[in-house]
Regions:
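Glycine-rich phosphate-binding loops of nucleotide-dependent enzymes
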Residues: 2-253
Length: 253
């Protein structure tokens, strides 16, 4: 039986009302430590709004968010990130004309509060080289350390984004559609990477690719019309008539 201490992220009655339109309604979420938890649902189900609430880019209309037992409902996004709850992929996290190594160094610089004065900070940034190379190795990009991001294949850019997110020293990562826009080969590589890093980090992801969800996720929460419709593993949910009906004729790609 899972105890409360096993849950790194919890919500109680999480609700967001946009002037009468309820985008998220009374969502109770439990994300277990060191698990991969997927949030899925048809278009307009409330997945992105839920992510924005969890990372504090939106203020809840009602409900509570607990991270590692701490109430973060009223906290600012930057403060939540400093606690180790970090979101990736909602915007590109890389600078296209910097190399992979330079991108990770800048992320490390941000995390450690070093100066962003690029024309004077080379000595400061050089201090982070060792850790940056470790992170590139973790995501399988060691041989691309000196390659500008703009020259990297799409899947490798995603891996670099994960490396820059890891540089922020998260305990839990929220991945917003990590497979968006990828071909099959890149999807396989990034899925393998996410599986590998889940040994050290808790992952909550929104993902439309149900094959990826089936292969990666320990737990899946299905949202529809802003509410939790069902929760469980893929094998059980794929047999749930309510889940089938929610997706029947509804776009989820």
């Amino acid at each position: 039986m899972t105890s409360a201490s096993d849950h790194v992220l919890q919500t109680e009655g999480l609700t967001k009302d946009f002037r009468g339109f309820v985008a998220v309604k009374a969502v109770n979420l439990r994300v277990r430590r060191h698990s991969i938890h997927a949030l899925i649902g048809p278009n307009g189900a409330g997945k992105t709004t839920c992510f924005n609430l969890l990372t504090k880019f939106l203020k809840p209309s009602a409900g509570q968010i607990l991270y590692k037992g701490k109430d973060i409902t009223a906290m600012a996004p930057a403060d939540v990130a400093r606690l180790g709850l970090v979101r990736s992929f909602q915007i590109s996290a890389v600078f296209p004309h910097l190399t992979a190594l330079e991108n990770v160094r800048v992320a490390l610089q941000r995390q450690h509060g070093a100066s962003f004065d690029f024309w004077r900070s080379k000595t400061v940034l050089d201090r982070f080289n060792g850790r940056a190379r470790e992170l590139l190795n973790d995501v399988g990009l060691s041989e691309f350390a000196d390659t500008p991001a703009v020259e990297m294949a799409y899947g490798r850019k995603r891996a670099l984004e994960i490396a820059t997110t890891l540089a922020l020293d998260p305990e839990m990562m929220l991945l917003d559609e990590p497979m968006a826009g990828m071909g099959h080969e890149d999807i396989d590589k990034v899925a393998a990477l996410i599986k590998r890093i889940s040994a050290k980090y808790t992952i909550l992801m929104v993902e439309h690719n149900l094959n990826v969800v089936a292969n990666l996720s320990d737990t899946i929460t299905v949202l529809t019309r802003g509410q939790v419709l069902a929760e469980g593993n893929y094998a059980d949910l794929s047999k749930d008539e309510r889940v089938k009906e929610a997706y029947l004729g509804a776009g989820h790609g």
